[in-house]
Amino acid sequence: MKKIINKKSETFLEKYLNNASPTGFEWEGQKVWLDYLKPYIDDHYVDNYGTAVGVINPNAEYKVVIEAHADEISWFVHYITKEGFIYVCRNGGSDHLIAPSMRVNIHTKKGIVKAVFGWPAIHTRHEKEETPSMKNIFLDCGVDSKEAVEALGVHVGCVVTFQDEFMIMQGNKYVGRALDNRIGGFMIAEVTRLLHENKVKLPYSLHVVNAVQEEIGLRGAQMIAQRIQPHLAIVTDVCHDTGSPMMNKIQQGDTVSGKGPVLTYGPAVQNNVLNMIIENAENAKIPYQRAAVSRSTGTDTDAFAYSNDGVPSALISLPLRYMHTTVEMAHKDDVENCIRLIYETLLNVQSGQGFKYF
């Protein structure tokens, strides 16, 4: 198959991933995303909380959404000791176990303040070692008093992110923090580029949505779903690659990097939409995998599905290793196949198409 991702695409991806977009503070990353999207869309807008939307064929009555979320997990400055050490609380599902020895950026009005998560040296720890927890992990920004910390511009409520570093391993693995889910934002942007470059005339209005605040409860998607009131929503997010060590396939399912997009079965996923996507995958010879969820998908799919009296929705997921770490890893072939599958599905959606079961 012809490759989709080009040099310009990967330059955008690197810039986008290396630009912090913590939950509730997504706007700098959203600017990067929207600037890339603008040549390929007819209109765009941003809502009050920062969700960005590009629109193709805005005057059509039938509305289709393709969606990803823009925010990343992070921390808040929570307490500053008189000695200048900083304790944090979570902003989203940040992992305390990986924090010790990590370098971070504290975002202040004066600019970025560098700091590290400190941890006692191995020589000094007792036989019964403490494990990292929210009670004992702390930041050190190289000063020795609360007043010195505050003089840097750091205060309670400042957001903290792990330092940026995107890389490509072995030519086909994307690695870095915040692939969950800015890689999704990248994928829907590439779908939009393909539609433009291939001069596709859609018979409906396409809303390309990069939602905020997914990591703390799908909040951005809830807001924008009410505003758009779409007739169909195709959501993309990441799921666990269960092929690496310490993963239990009996509990987590069998979804592996390099074997294609993952299509989810669950109550929020409208089966006629899912079957349409599967049919498009098979017709276009796009590999795919299956997953099942017992209740919610845990993604913005749920927010769209249960909005506006029910929006037919489906989820296309990218297998991801080491989720919510600084070394999240995705296979480039899977990224391309997710893009391809969304694109092929959009080509086969008809204006006015209904999805009721009977």
Q: What are these regions, as identified by a protein language model?
A:
Residues 1-358:
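N-terminal hydrophobic/helix-forming segments and targeting peptides
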